[in-house]
């Protein structure tokens, strides 16, 4: 895998963007590839004085001694805290009032850890700093929050980060720290929680955040989470309430959000085409998503398949393959896996190569009582919101009189549709 190099990324910004690729090589025990990529990346970007130790420089005693010596020389006349004093043990040993008094000195020491890639000490120190400090001007802790995020990502240790950032976000409201939580969940691979935090982001994102995440990348991550964990009501909420999304990202990055709109309109054929031709390649190159690219694609297509199956009681393997933009064998395998894992309540007709949904008894009873009314509403609803793929499955559903749960992705399930008289 080629490590993409963007000339706009310098210093630690470059490390944050590409560190996970290096860690993937290291964790896979492909040490030759790992070493090759470290050397290649460090030569290309030259972002540390000790580039070969960019991941865990604190594990090298020789480098640590050199850093300590250089730090003392650099700050000998500034009365800045020594390296040992600035260690997390220092924060453990002093009171809150002393933390406030020495705050600037502590932050300067953490800047040293940060600039020299000593992420272990930076992470532990920032954690204790953020946990103990109270009533400090929010501008003063912004830097510590961002650097805590950076060190957490580099160390791949998410065990403590969420509680402390949640606590900070509740106490300090000048900036929206949900963006930090969103990004941490995304990098960890918890896309469901990332999507939840996305809904809470309103505005006032710390400017320092954009030193590490480009605006275009943020737009891509937003669109990715909306697609991965799509919910029509959530999408409407984002469109209505998320100021940074509406005013800064949505119109500017239609190449991403246009695909979400296709999903919103049930245009599954084009959604899958766009996924295969655009999103898949970007996911494979993204340092924070590339390690999960196969499972992302699998889950995404399975999610669409389950939604398609909720529209009808039977559909052919061929039609499913066309809608998902996969071959028939892969479509068949997906259906079998969903049924065997109890994610799809259906049976397979091997002779006719179709999959048949099991219809609940209560829905059958409802159908018998109100068949004509329901069928008329279904026909109207198809015309309203399902034109993009009606021609693909109409021959599968005509005359079946099936109550389908979710034809209109925009607002209603079937029960809401019947209660409120259709979409507005």
Label every PLM stretch briefly:
Residues 1-424:
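Charged, E/D/K/R/S-rich low-complexity terminal regions of large eukaryotic assembly subunits
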């Amino acid at each position: 895998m080629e490590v993409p190099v963007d000339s706009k990324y310098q210093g630690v910004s470059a490390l944050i963007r590409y560190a996970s690729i290096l860690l993937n090589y290291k964790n896979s025990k492909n040490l030759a590839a790992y070493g090759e990529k470290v050397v290649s990346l460090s030569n290309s970007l030259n972002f540390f004085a000790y580039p070969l130790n960019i991941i865990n420089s604190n594990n090298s005693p020789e480098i640590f001694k050199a850093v300590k010596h250089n730090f003392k020389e650099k700050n000998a006349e500034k009365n800045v805290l020594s390296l040992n004093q600035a260690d997390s043990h220092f924060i453990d040993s002093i009171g809150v009032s002393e933390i406030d008094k020495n705050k600037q000195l502590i932050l300067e020491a953490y800047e040293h850890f940060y600039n020299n890639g000593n992420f272990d000490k930076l992470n532990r120190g920032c954690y204790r700093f953020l946990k103990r400090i109270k009533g400090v001007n929010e501008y003063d802790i912004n830097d510590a929050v961002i650097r805590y995020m950076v060190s957490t990502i580099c160390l791949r240790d998410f065990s403590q980060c969420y509680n402390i950032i949640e606590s900070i976000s509740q106490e300090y409201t000048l900036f929206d720290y949900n963006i930090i939580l969103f990004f941490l969940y995304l990098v960890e691979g918890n896309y469901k929680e990332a999507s939840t935090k996305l809904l809470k982001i309103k505005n006032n994102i710390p400017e320092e955040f954009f030193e590490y995440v480009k605006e275009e990348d943020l737009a891509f991550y937003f669109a990715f989470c909306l697609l991965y964990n799509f919910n029509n009501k959530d999408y409407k909420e984002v469109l209505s309430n998320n100021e940074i999304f509406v005013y800064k990202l949505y119109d500017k990055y239609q190449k991403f959000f246009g695909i979400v709109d296709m999903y919103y309109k049930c245009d599954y054929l084009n959604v899958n085409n766009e996924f295969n031709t655009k999103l898949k390649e970007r996911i494979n190159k993204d340092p924070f998503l590339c390690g999960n690219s196969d499972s992302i694609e699998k889950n995404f297509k399975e999610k669409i398949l389950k939604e398609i199956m909720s529209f009808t009681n039977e559909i052919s393997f061929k039609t499913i393959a066309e809608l998902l933009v996969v071959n028939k064998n892969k479509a068949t395998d997906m259906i079998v896996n969903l049924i065997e894992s109890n994610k799809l309540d259906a049976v397979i007709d091997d002779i006719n190569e179709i999959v048949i949904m099991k219809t609940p008894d209560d829905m059958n009873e409802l159908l018998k009582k109100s068949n004509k009314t329901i069928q008329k509403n279904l026909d109207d609803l198809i015309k309203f919101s399902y034109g993009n793929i009606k021609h693909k499955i109409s021959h599968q559903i005509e005359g079946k009189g099936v109550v389908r749960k979710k034809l209109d992705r925009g607002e209603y399930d079937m029960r809401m549709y019947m209660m409120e008289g259709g979409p507005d």
